[in-house]
Amino acid sequence: MKRATTTKSFIENGSVLESSVSIKIKLDDLSGGEVVELLEEHLADMYATSPAESVHALDLDGLKSPEITFFSAWKDSRLLGCVAIKELDTQHAELKSMRTSQFARKSGVASQLLQHVLDTAAVRQYKTISLETGSEDYFKPARNLYEKFGFGYCEPFADYVLDPHSQLMSIELR
């Protein structure tokens, strides 16, 4: 388990926390109700914002595949977000199911989760991390985050094809 700290504020029980927020990012087996609810919310939003044929988010069973490692972020007993990494081959992995809980948005949690995945990828010696996200305005904050971390737009990878509703991005690790 990795402990990360963010100094940005987030709302908890109706009040804004101004001090540093210590979060725990842990390997997750997808058995907890809070995680299942967050993933159901994630899928519902994906289908509400993109045509069904352009939704590449995985359901619970898909995330339990052996090539996928799933992480969740917590403050005490409160779920802040989740992310997964899918091994495509020994040098290439895909970021999947990045989601921040509604109350924890704009608090730095997504940055902590993304950094955790990049650190995990470096330890596993992947050379490239790729991802698919939507092209709609709803996904602009996610694209901005990925760009901030150095991801650039790329050609289709794995089983993806060009799609006007998708943006494909990747980063080369050092």
Which ranges hold each PLM region?
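Terminal substrate-recognition subdomain of acyl/acetyltransferases
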Residues: 2-19, 133, 158-159, 163-174
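Acetyl-CoA-dependent GNAT
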Residues: 21-92, 96, 101, 114-115, ...
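Generic structural signal for conserved hydrophobic packing positions in ordered secondary structure
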Residues: 39, 95, 129-131, 139, ...
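A generic structural signal for beta-strand entry/edge sites
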Residues: 90-92, 128, 166
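Conserved acetyl-CoA-binding loop-helix of GNAT-fold acetyltransferases
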Residues: 100, 106-119, 144-148
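Residue-level recognition of the GNAT/N-acetyltransferase active site
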Residues: 101, 134-136
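Conserved active-site alpha-helix within GNAT-family acetyltransferase domains
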Residues: 111, 136-155, 162-164
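Conserved GNAT acetyl-CoA-binding A-motif
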Residues: 121-134
